[in-house]
Amino acid sequence: MPDFKELKNKIKHGDFQFVYDELKKSDFEYTLENIEKEFSSVDNRDMFCYLLYVVSNENTPKYTILLCDYLMHSGTFFYNRETVIRYLLDNCLVKSGNDITLIEWILSMYEYNPDSPYNEKEIANFNRIYDSLK
């Protein structure tokens, strides 16, 4: 089990590679619940930067969704977060193709959300893609 006190301090000081390596060695399960449990005292900006670092190393739907969930549910610290979320999702969609988990997440968060970064036409297109994948 990693020393989370040390890892929190390393995140605070921007030593993301150390934290990434330690968590990888310990098979840490990156979930929003685990992040909030183990790193609750870490500043939101620092945690966002660390999770962005994780995505830069492993740009997968799992980590992209985790980062987007973090932005949605863990105390937003900037305006227009949806612009950043859309960038992350679009980038991962390009890399991963039409990954069903990404499309499900987009639809679950934004299909009926007036703050959606996606317009109605784009949401309709995601619905068509989703229907073709299931």
Report the location of each language-model feature.
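Amphipathic alpha-helical repeat scaffolds of TPR domains
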Residues: 20-36, 57-74, 97-112
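Alpha-helical repeat scaffolds
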Residues: 6, 17-23, 45-56, 81-94, ...
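Short coil/turn connectors between adjacent alpha-helices in alpha-solenoid helical repeat scaffolds
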Residues: 33-41, 72-84, 111-123
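Terminal domain-start segments
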Residues: 1-47
